[in-house]
């Protein structure tokens, strides 16, 4: 039996469109979390998938949450620089920001702009989860004594998971 090619093409096109629509809905409903910070956010000394933002996303997804965690950490960053780039790296629609100011302000003699970052994010309706420097005490560090090992970053991600899940309302 020879079917007209339209009998095959139309269902195939409809199936393709349904798949695209399902992907778009799935992607659109994913909550966005931005990890904004310095080298311990970036994951200095470890692979990108071992930094805490990537591990946090994996933990949340394993719990069934549709979430995307963006790593906006920069080695050596100051809170002044974070404030300057914040609107660019924290897009509208972001559900939460994990803010890790780091210790570079003090080392570089720069003003601490953490409160201003928090205020501006809150004014945009974005939940702010602070990750203070003392959160890294007692965790496994690399030989430099400042940056965590993959295990240490995993411990940070685990400690943040419930706060992030609550902040994004999932």
Task: Give names to the regions the model predicted.
Residues 19-24:
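Hydrophobic alpha-helical membrane-insertion segments, chiefly the h-region
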Residues 29, 65-68:
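Residue-level signal for beta-strand positions within conserved beta-sheet cores that form or flank
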Residues 31-46:
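Short glycine-rich His-centered loop
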Residues 54-66, 74-170:
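Alpha-helical cap/lid subdomain in secreted, periplasmic
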